[in-house]
Amino acid sequence: MAATVKKTGSKKSKRNVPNGVVHIQSTFNNTIVSISDTSGHVISWSSAGASGFKGARKGTPFAAQTAAEAAARRALDQGMRQIEVLVRGPGAGRETAIRALQVAGLEITLIRDVTPLPHNGCRRPKRRRV
């Protein structure tokens, strides 16, 4: 009978991080929520695609809500209580993701819009004619 081999690999430790920063990138096609500590190390992340949505449904507000809830659940397990929210992009899931973080039990101290605005940089794509 074969002997069982004990694994000696490093197990991810649960650290206690009370404060953090939530980055919400909301595009027309997807919403990505990543939660980091104040120094920038990512604690948890989720996206509409990782939450099981495919295709056009990834850009919906409900998909953004589901992604934010999943990321918040993992951050709460690490002991996070207070967050600052940085929102980037024009997508439909911006407000819904923020509301989902609040309902999950995280206390929001700041909401900042960090959407990049070009000072007449690259040429825009031509208009769609449908």
Curated annotation (Swiss-Prot):
Located on the platform of the 30S subunit, it bridges several disparate RNA helices of the 16S rRNA. Forms part of the Shine-Dalgarno cleft in the 70S ribosome. One of its GO terms (molecular function) is rRNA binding. This is Small ribosomal subunit protein uS11. It comes from Prochlorococcus marinus (strain MIT 9215). Belongs to the universal ribosomal protein uS11 family. It comes from the Bacteria. InterPro entries: Ribosomal_uS11, Ribosomal_uS11_bac-type, Ribosomal_uS11_CS, Ribosomal_uS11_sf. GO terms for cellular component: ribonucleoprotein complex; ribosome. Pfam families: Ribosomal_S11. GO terms for biological process: translation. The gene is rpsK. Part of the 30S ribosomal subunit. Interacts with proteins S7 and S18. Binds to IF-3. Keywords: Ribonucleoprotein, Ribosomal protein, RNA-binding, rRNA-binding.
